[in-house]
Amino acid sequence: MRGWFARFRSRFREPRAGLVVTASTELAPGHYVLPDPSDGALRIVGDDLVLDGQGVLLDGGGRGGVGIVLVGCRRVVLRNLTVRGYAWALVAIDCEELLVEDCDFSHNGRSDGTFLDITRVDEGAGGGVKLVRSTASRIVRLQATGQDIGVDLVSCRGIVVADCDLSHNAAWGIRLHGSTDCRLERNRAHHVNRCGGAGCDAAGILLTWGSHRNRVAGNDLRWSGDGFFLGNQFSPPSNDNLVVGNDGSYSPNNAFEATFSRGNVFRRNRACWSNYGFWLGFSTDTVLEENLIADNRIDGVHWEHGARGILRANLIARNGRDGVAFTLDPTNRDFPDRCVSTGHELCGNRFVANSRAAVFLLHTTATRLVGNRYETERTPVLLAGDTRENDIQDVFRTT
């Protein structure tokens, strides 16, 4: 018996506050209340190791701090860990090739009732995983709910976040702040909201501050402040992202928003039952193709002060005002170099029963409509203001 107990003790390590992990370790099962002494309740120091916490709950007791901290580590695996009651469950800085899998990092730092500042790198009270200046890492099958942020990627590159449940948070399911070439795939980030459901810039997924060339695919973003939010008004633009096969419906604001940006592509998404399906203010060279944009309270697509947009093969139906609205406010001189609404192309779209008009052009020029189909539309195309030099080739046979 003494020999068996000795072998058990040698295999498992009992967590304690301030524990430094330097080699592969299995933590002894149990519920451990471990306050953060200042630099993490547990710290990982070293490369090429595995921390396995099957049956372990690390509990910060709601006193803030960080559950697990890694700085400058490479090829570390964290699996089967449950961490709650801290500001952040896991913070990794300047790390490479991390793998976080099958962990529960829920019920950490949370705030509510205040409008979020999407440009602040330290916005939010905390959450599940925060990676800073880290690369080539994977976060898979993570549960991180009931807090401000599920996964926060700051100045990262090549991160994969897949098959995670990041729902019912109060700020963002996933935030990318200055992070590029990442893949966000098949995650659940629904019901991410605050301010009593008004949103206050909460979103299922947020991209900001120069987050380029990311792939956002197959995520459930319903019932969030915005489903998908790419916002950059007073920060570097976030360009050339591919957003495909996501559902951002039932937002109190916008199912999908992409502003002050260039070259983003939205393909085969669902944008329904929100205030707006797509809000694309001050963006250029944006592509919408094969999306379902229906039953929104105001416009299916609202695009102010934009240029060179392409809308191709979308179904745009039963929106409360216009199917697509291209607009310009000549009195808005906040961004004088963007005081245009011009050069858009709509081709092969199907418009059905939008309340005021299928397409509304206000102070819009050099825009082309060709091969679109109009069904039970009261007004296929409505022109207003200084709208001129447009190429409208559609034959308006409404059925």
What spans do the regions from the language model cover?
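Acidic, glycine- and Ser/Thr-rich low-complexity intrinsically disordered tracts
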Residues: 2-6, 10-12, 339, 347-353, ...
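Proline-centered turn/helix-capping motifs that create local helix->coil transitions or kinks
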Residues: 108-113, 192-193, 225
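Terminal non-domain segments
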Residues: 1-9, 140, 145, 162
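Parallel beta-helix/beta-solenoid
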Residues: 16, 22, 45-48, 53, ...
